[in-house]
A protein has these predicted regions:
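Substrate-binding pocket helix/loop in short-chain dehydrogenase/reductase
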Residues: 94-95, 99-107, 200
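Residue(s) in the substrate-gating loop at a strand-loop-helix junction
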Residues: 136
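Alpha-helical segment proximal to the catalytic Tyr-Lys
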Residues: 123, 165-169, 228
Length: 277
């Protein structure tokens, strides 16, 4: 019988790539997203491949969304085997520039919604089911800016670890991937910045930049029966960025420019050991 995966943020970026990989490997997809136009891409892809798909245009932070998403899977396919919590948002702001509304937005979308979706999916799961949470390398190591983002993604790793321990004895696995920065609608503005792009390249030992397809391969592997003895793990998909203290030869010999007076890129005035404000 065909396995069924529920994917959030399925209309673009990593979510669309994950959905494509599932369909290509004969896994039916229930795609969730806010934008019907983006979900239409997934529907067109499924039609092209001749594979089954169901979509639901809904904000996953809404109270009724988790139950509606799981109900759609059961109604259309009679089962649910995998949940991929992928929906996310990015913001390049450090903690002292992040207001409560932004903090709530990030925690609601990238921690509370995955928690509630997992809770609903677990009620429908049987042995052999799995959850794959899409976290970030910035949940593993510190980085500049993105305070709310890092906090939410790190919380997602904590949730992953708990669920692996709690539900492993029922044959339900929970794992996470931690992607580096790959080109998506959410990250394109950062990758267009020459300084960020060079920093990312100089700190990555692999010989190329990552893609959404790289992340999709990892997600779909962890969701598959082939990963049946993998539980509670975080797989960094970043070309070695997070685990190796690496600088390219060009960066090693580069001269560090002096910092100009005033605020630095870290958000603190040079020489100021007090609180930013």
């Amino acid at each position: 019988m065909m396995r069924v995966a529920l994917v959030t943020g399925a209309g673009s970026g990593i979510g669309l790539a994950v959905s494509r990989k599932f369909l290509q490997t004969d896994v039916a997809v229930v795609g969730i997203g806010r934008d019907p136009a983006k979900l239409a891409r997934l529907e067109a892809l499924a039609a092209e491949l001749g594979k089954p798909v169901a979509t639901l245009a809904v904000d996953v932070t809404q109270d009724a969304a988790p139950a509606a998403a799981v109900a759609l899977a059961i109604e259309r396919f009679g089962r649910l085997d995998c949940l991929v919590n992928n929906a996310g948002v990015g913001s390049p702001k450090p903690v002292h520039e992040t207001d409560d509304a932004t903090l709530d937005q990030f925690l609601d979308l990238m921690l509370r919604a995955p928690f509630r979706l997992a809770r609903e999916a677990l009620r429908a799961f049987g042995p052999g089911s799995s959850i794959v949470n899409v976290a970030s390398t910035y949940a593993l190591v510190g980085g500049l800016r993105g305070g709310a983002y890092s906090a939410a993604k790190a919380g997602l790793l904590g949730l992953t670890s708990h669920m692996a321990a709690q539900y492993g004895s029922a044959g339900i696995r929970s794992n996470a991937v931690a992607p580096g920065v790959v080109p998506t609608d959410m990250t394109i503005h950062r990758l267009q910045d020459q300084g960020f792009r060079r920093m990312n390249d100089d700190m990555t030992p692999s010989d190329r930049r990552g893609t959404v397809e790289d992340v999709a391969e990892a997600v779909c592997f962890l969701a598959s029966p082939a990963a049946g003895w993998i539980n509670g793990q975080v797989l960094a998909v970043d070309g070695g960025w997070s685990s190796i203290k690496f600088l390219s030869e060009e960066a090693l010999v580069a001269e560090r420019l002096p910092v100009q007076p005033g605020w630095t890129h870290s958000g603190r005035a040079r020489g100021d050991r007090g609180q930013p404000g």
